[in-house]
């Protein structure tokens, strides 16, 4: 075991040769490298699999014999300063390594087929391998300087991957937005690192925690300054994990390829902020204000992310806001001091969300066979529907991930989320109510995505547009408008939601259906899609199931989603003590954080089942509401007079709710809570106005003074030149004038004092 720890540093660089060899091959042998491009997936998966095997072995050893291993190399600059590099192997490192490698391997296998037709295939795998190397280096770092170095490499990889299709303006803008937003948090992280080095004189985690805790307990540190430094450290986690108010980059980051969203923005990079918070929790836990702030930002983020997911018509953006909300749960757990619950939810959510993103990629892949490569169409929930008949395996996998994220037992996220909800009651009843309510909102928007995608009929073929007349009504989806427009046509919302989508409609009739103007350009391709099987332009193609390599990754992630919760479920050992795998693995970290370990490891089944009943009931209610609004099966109820009279009664009595509250909710959600508008209007425009004022001041005032002195000197010189004409009488006149002026001033001053 000691031998493995001794050479553990090699793990960090195992996958680094892949991007290097791809780069050298493209530079020296471009033709041969591109012709053999599909072979590069094998070394990428192989090297990452080696890291996974080592990580799994280390995790098993730590479960059997809990320990922490630290190795450091010192590079002395002078007698007063030295740089130390090393690696830290503890339970948190093992968990993150297994998470990064398992999801990374499955995403690489998935990407081999998903990106096979892309010209940037080799560039994609080079970026992905370099990103995996950076993440492995980040989680094995033994000090803050190493973390910051790999932190920046991860940010650079994120920039490259989000802007992978850099010729698209939206992708180019998205990667710039992500880069700039994360630089705000990274600048705070750097200042926090420098601040704690000034306080403690060390950046090694072991020394940093010990020295700082002693300073706090002995009241030898300025707590205000220490709190400020801790907040600056946490600012890096806020930006990287898309927490309010630095969350604005995450939905735009969906402009990258879908496998990137699954790896970076579900399982690893956004989880890096949670990792940093967990790594520095021994530092934060002695400062109650910071812990309360972390919990507050977490509760705001989880609620905000859930509400912003309501109106997203892009399937990937909806999942992005879901990620933001679930990361809020993890931040809330860290703020409450629930170290185990935060990491448990980090694990379960990573596999469930990766499954959902890969499922969405399979859906997009199948839709592109109809609409072509057009993200505005292939990712549009309004144009989907009825896909369960065409992509049954994808549908089952997506449903599994959806149920897990909703917190339905016995799937993974049920166990971890309920543990956070249980702890929230002990921390703050208000926070608990918000967290429980958000569980219902999560179930609502996730099943909204599922129902709009898989139930009913393929809306792409049911929606046509005639002429250039602009429709002012809603599309089929409640939250499906492209942009906000005031509705001039009077209609009731509930009859629209329950309209019958099951009616058989012939495409050869001239009957038209109203749809948003933004998809009017689809009328050509929809009508004239050729079908090679029938040889006619009037035959329609339909989505198809993805290739086996893509389905394999989804099936494996589905198994993880089903069974990953087992690691956090307590069982009775031979001594009758309740103990689970995760708690046993985290024993060294729990001992470091808490002295009273026994209370933390006890599991009250009665309390858990009681809270689980509440949470599952709330989630079921959210699913029921989503099914009522979006499931086409409920449209058959409109044929009953009782239901029609009920709808009419609601329309008359709750007109304000229907026309105002729902529209306000839609506007809030569709416009991203007006936060982007606030930044664009006040922050960006304010900076531009300030820069223009500075430019004006520099040109007119600063340059005006210097230029004015020069011009004044010129005119004075010119005036003196004309005075000095060589006549003594002129010189005497000027001399006498200055003397008289001096005497006049002097005499007035003397009289004033007399």
From Swiss-Prot:
Catalytic activity, reaction form: a plastoquinone + NADH + (n+1) H(+)(in) = a plastoquinol + NAD(+) + n H(+)(out); a plastoquinone + NADPH + (n+1) H(+)(in) = a plastoquinol + NADP(+) + n H(+)(out)
Q: What is its EC number?
A: 7.1.1.-
Q: Which InterPro entries match?
A: NADH_UbQ_OxRdtase_chlpt_su5_C (IPR002128), NADHpl_OxRdtase_5_subgr (IPR018393), ND/Mrp_TM (IPR001750), NU5C-like (IPR003945), Proton_antipo_N (IPR001516)
Keywords tagged on the record: Chloroplast, Membrane, NAD, NADP, Plastid, Plastoquinone, Quinone, Thylakoid, Translocase, Transmembrane, Transmembrane helix, Transport
Example GO molecular function? quinone binding
Q: Which domain of life is it from?
A: Eukaryota
Q: Name one Pfam family in it.
A: Proton_antipo_C
Q: How does it sit in the membrane?
A: Multi-pass membrane protein
Q: What class of enzyme is it?
A: translocase
Keyword Repeat included in the entry's annotation? no
**Record-annotated membrane-spanning stretches:** 8-28, 40-60, 89-109, 125-145, 147-167, 185-205, 219-239, 258-278, 280-300, 327-347, 354-374, 396-416, 425-445, 552-572, 608-628, 733-753
Q: Name one GO biological process term.
A: ATP synthesis coupled electron transport
Functional summary from the UniProt entry: NDH shuttles electrons from NAD(P)H:plastoquinone, via FMN and iron-sulfur (Fe-S) centers, to quinones in the photosynthetic chain and possibly in a chloroplast respiratory chain. The immediate electron acceptor for the enzyme in this species is believed to be plastoquinone. Couples the redox reaction to proton translocation, and thus conserves the redox energy in a proton gradient.
User: This protein is called what?
Assistant: NAD(P)H-quinone oxidoreductase subunit 5, chloroplastic
Q: In which organism is this protein found?
A: Morus indica (Mulberry)
Question: What gene name does this entry carry?
Answer: ndhF
């Amino acid at each position: 075991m000691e031998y493995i720890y001794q050479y553990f540093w090699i793990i960090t660089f195992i996958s680094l040769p892949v991007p290097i060899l791809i780069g050298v091959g493209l530079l020296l042998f471009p033709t041969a490298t591109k012709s053999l491009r599909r072979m590069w997936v094998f070394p990428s998966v192989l090297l990452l699999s080696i890291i996974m095997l080592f990580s799994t072995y280390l995790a098993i050893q730590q479960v059997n014999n809990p320990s922490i291993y630290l190795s450091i190399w010192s590079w002395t600059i002078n007698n007063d300063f030295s740089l130390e590099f090393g690696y830290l192997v503890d339970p948190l490192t093992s968990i993150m390594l297994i998470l990064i490698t398992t999801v990374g391997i499955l995403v690489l296998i998935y990407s081999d087929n998903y990106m096979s037709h892309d010209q940037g295939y080799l560039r994609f795998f080079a970026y992905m391998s370099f990103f995996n190397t950076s993440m492995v280096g980040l989680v094995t770092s033994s000090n803050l300087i190493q973390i910051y170095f790999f932190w920046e490499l991860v940010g650079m990889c994120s920039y490259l991957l989000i802007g992978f299709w850099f010729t698209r303006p939206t992708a180019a803008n998205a990667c710039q937005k992500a880069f700039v937003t994360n630089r705000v948090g990274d600048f705070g992280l750097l200042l926090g690192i420098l601040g704690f080095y000034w306080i403690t004189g060390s950046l090694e985690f072991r020394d940093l925690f010990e020295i700082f805790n002693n300073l706090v307990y002995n009241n030898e540190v300025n707590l205000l300054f220490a709190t400020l430094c801790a907040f600056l450290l946490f600012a890096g986690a806020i930006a990287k994990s898309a927490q309010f108010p630095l969350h604005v980059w995450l939905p735009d980051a969906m402009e990258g390829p879908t496998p990137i969203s699954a790896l970076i923005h579900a399982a690893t990079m956004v989880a890096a902020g949670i990792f940093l918070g967990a790594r520095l929790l021994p530092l934060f836990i002695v400062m109650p204000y910071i812990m309360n702030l972390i919990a507050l930002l977490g509760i705001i983020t989880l609620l905000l992310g859930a509400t912003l997911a309501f109106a997203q018509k892009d399937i990937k953006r909806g999942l992005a806001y879901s990620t933001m909300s679930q990361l809020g749960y993890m931040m809330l757990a860290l703020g409450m001091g629930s170290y185990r619950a935060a990491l448990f939810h980090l694990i379960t959510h990573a596999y469930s969300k990766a499954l959902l993103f890969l499922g969405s990629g399979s859906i997009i892949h199948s839709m592109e066979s109809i609409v072509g490569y057009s993200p505005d169409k292939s990712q549009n929930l309004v144009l989907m529907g009825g896909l369960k008949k065409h992509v049954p395996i994808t549908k089952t996998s997506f449903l599994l991930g959806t149920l897990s994220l909703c917190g339905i037992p016995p799937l993974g996220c049920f166990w971890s989320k309920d543990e956070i909800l249980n702890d929230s009651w002990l921390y703050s009843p208000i926070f608990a109510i918000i967290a429980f309510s958000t569980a219902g909102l999560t179930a609502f928007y996730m099943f909204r995505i599922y129902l709009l995608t898989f139930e009913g009929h393929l809306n792409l073929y049911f929606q046509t547009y005639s002429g250039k007349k602009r429709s002012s009504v809603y599309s089929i989806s409640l939250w499906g408008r492209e942009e906000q427009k005031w509705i001039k046509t009077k209609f009731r919302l509930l009859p629209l939601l329950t309209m019958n989508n099951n009616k058989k409609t012939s495409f050869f009739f001239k009957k038209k259906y109203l749809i948003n103007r933004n998809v009017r350009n689809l009328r050509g391709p929809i009508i004239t899609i050729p079908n090679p099987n029938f040889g006619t332009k009037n035959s329609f193609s339909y989505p198809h199931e993805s290739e086996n390599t893509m389905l394999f990754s989804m099936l494996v992630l589905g198994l993880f989603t089903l069974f990953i919760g087992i690691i956090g479920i307590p069982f009775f050992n031979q001594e009758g003590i309740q103990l689970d795998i995760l708690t046993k693995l985290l024993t060294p970290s729990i001992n470091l954080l808490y002295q009273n370990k026994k209370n933390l490891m006890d599991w009250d089944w009665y309390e858990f089942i009681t809270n689980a009943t509440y949470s599952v009931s709330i989630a079921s209610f959210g699913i029921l509401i989503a099914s009522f609004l979006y499931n086409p099966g409920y449209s058959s109820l409109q044929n009953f007079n009782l239901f029609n009279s009920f709808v009419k009664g609601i329309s008359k009595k709750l007109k304000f709710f229907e026309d105002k509250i729902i529209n306000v909710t839609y506007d809030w959600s569709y416009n991203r809570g007006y936060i982007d508008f606030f930044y664009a209007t006040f922050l960006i425009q304010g900076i531009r106005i300030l820069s223009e004022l500075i430019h004006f001041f520099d040109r007119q005032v600063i340059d005006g003074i210097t230029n004015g002195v020069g011009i004044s000197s010129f005119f004075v010189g010119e005036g003196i030149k004309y005075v000095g004409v060589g006549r003594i009488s002129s010189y005497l006149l000027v001399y006498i004038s200055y003397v008289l002026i001096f005497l006049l001033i002097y005499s007035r001053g003397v009289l004033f004092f007399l």
